[in-house]
């Protein structure tokens, strides 16, 4: 394990402990948006939302890959599969199906906001697996959903994050073209080892989709040619 993965694991572990055991603060920033729709104000919580949005504009979806406790658990599940079956390549979803499913989370995002407005309830919070994990809005349904997606992540890496997470959809809007981007350079020999390790099933050697990337840097850590760099967006390709 290289230094960046060690740092990421430390970050994920600390944020997991903080959000799950040390705070009653609503972790899901999507919940803050729902609260704004219902009450017209979120008080000091708006500062937390602004920080995450600004961080995403600068670095991309770093929250998803470094801070989210749910993503941390899903990652543990697919890596457990890799260890048990001694696989080097992550399982993939049919490309045509995958390319359609990635838009499903935007449907979840819009539907959740519409239902929140018209039903005057925290629509997504009622079923959100994070709610159960952090003991905030946990329901039987959210427990079932948590167990389902933990199980699914054993077979489809980061399935919830890829296809269903409204917070991921929200942050994707701000990470279409972040200031710092992950890019391939002229060292790339198209071996696709980076793609074999990408939990989001991104076609890195063809076009690295910044809004889908959760900044886990598994691709960069796996590259033997140092063909991936995380640099300022307007820096010329080397």
Curated annotation (Swiss-Prot):
* Keywords of the record: 4Fe-4S, Cell membrane, Electron transport, Iron, Iron-sulfur, Membrane, Metal-binding, Repeat, Transmembrane, Transmembrane helix, Transport
Q: Which InterPro entries match?
A: 4Fe4S_Fe-S-bd, 4Fe4S_Fe_S_CS, Electron_Trans/Redox
Q: Where in the cell is it found?
A: Cell membrane
Instruction: Identify the residues that bind [4Fe-4S] cluster 2.
Output: 198, 213, 216, 219
Question: By its UniProt entry, which SUPFAM superfamilies does this protein fall under?
Answer: 4Fe-4S ferredoxins
Topology relative to the membrane, per the entry?
Multi-pass membrane protein
Specify the protein name.
Answer: Uncharacterized protein MJ0750
